[in-house]
């Protein structure tokens, strides 16, 4: 197969043509600053308002609860740092999970250096947060619970409704990093008692450099970026109107096609999983088998070093990942795989393949065929595999 096979949609996605078409006029025709008072800026102002409603409709929020940011990482930083500052008089204890994206984990570590205490709740072997451990960790000085909606590496969908109920029971604010789940799986902020939510444009076939923060009305949160009075004086900086239009259109399209795309992606994903587990020995599927993002498959192959596997896949024209795109340059094993109990030597042999509605069954079968040959080749060069085969017949 001569064309590129892109199976790293959890890292970033191709911008939909309809999204690009919606954005283009705001670069060259309707380029006015939406904060300006003259009529020329009105088209930009209306475009921002429309996108705000498009985002709000996806999660069952009010338009005035939607704030635009520079991306998912900014939204996560804002959620933790600004909340910590705003609620520090009540307490300085924050709860999160051991498998969060580094935008959360590194921010939590920064807060620890600035006088806050963070509890990292464990997960089970499938990456589901331990709800009893979460509730037991809540203290009188707990000000925030932050748990992701779905894991970016292993695809496990977390029980947001149950987490939200626990947070509500104890009067604690609940934030979720929904970068991987937003517009891919149904989320309703009221039903799930979500106080804050982070999302990103480039994970839903929208542009890079634009994110979203949902902040429920009544939540105290300080400004994170200071300057002008944009975003109801909570997030300064001239609006990125083309990006805002893009994320709004992408969200609208994603939700309109969610049911159809989910059905299609699950069919391909399950075919991929079944072939890999059946045809490649000493392989493990990581993440929950059913409560899983529709496009995610994550495996560990024993006696394999992940970087070599990715290089050989790349030579075959296949784009995959060993985990998060934000850490794929690291040789350290995934903190997510270690948290679900995998030993270092197995975690090193991980592969994440994430599909899209444009992925074909032919591409999946080609990928599995190439992967089988690559695994066989790499294992043939492994003294550990040779020793294992000799001892186990």
Where do the language-model regions lie?
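Pyridoxal 5′-phosphate
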Residues: 1-393
